[in-house]
Amino acid sequence: AACLSPLGESLLGAGIRKELQPEFFAVTTRPPSAYSGYPFITEVGVAYGGKVLTSGLKLFRFANRIPLLYDEASDVAWKVISEEIDMRRYRIPSEAPIAVITHICSTKIPYKTVGKEYLADRPEVEYELKNATREVLRRLQHFLAHKGSMEVVKRKMNIYRKYLPLVARFATEMSGANRSPRYRRLLGEQDMDKQESIPDKQESIPDKQESIL
């Protein structure tokens, strides 16, 4: 494995961040492996959302730092992400803006044809690609779950901001207090110590003098 030169997670991540500008990305590098006596290292990255990606799954393939531009559907990487891995298991919508980036570095890349346009489906390479892709998809799943929970919290806070002031004012009027309760801290606001004063609604009652007959 000392003879191999992978991109590394930092360099691969920097490239994804620069070119795709994603909302989220994750990269991983698998331990060295071998097929037919030839060592290789598998690197996989995933990017989600952002300004560049559109809806649907996209695959970017590299071999020994050289991009592979043709015959994508014949590549073992496409077989892995389209047939071997179910995106629904990771709660990723089918139309999600997602890109998978694969890089194989080896002393002998297992090209299937002399044109060197796509990789053959070697079991060892397929195994490493599958495990690396699953790892980055799990990280994406955690991100999407956190994002979904934050959206739920945001919707709840919007409802609270709309109705809590009305509830507080109604409760103050019903109790006859002069000040409303300090409810704004529940909304995450900072200028919360200001209390709304409720005008006194006491009506003056004229003195009634009883006449003694």
Residue ranges: model-predicted function:
Residues 1-43:
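Glycine/threonine-rich ATP-lid/beta-loop region of ATP-binding domains
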Residues 1-17, 160, 165-193, 212:
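Gly/Gly-Pro- and Ser/Thr-rich, intrinsically disordered tail segments characteristic of DNA damage-repair
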Residues 47-185:
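Charged regulatory segments coupled to nucleotide-binding catalytic modules in large multidomain enzymes
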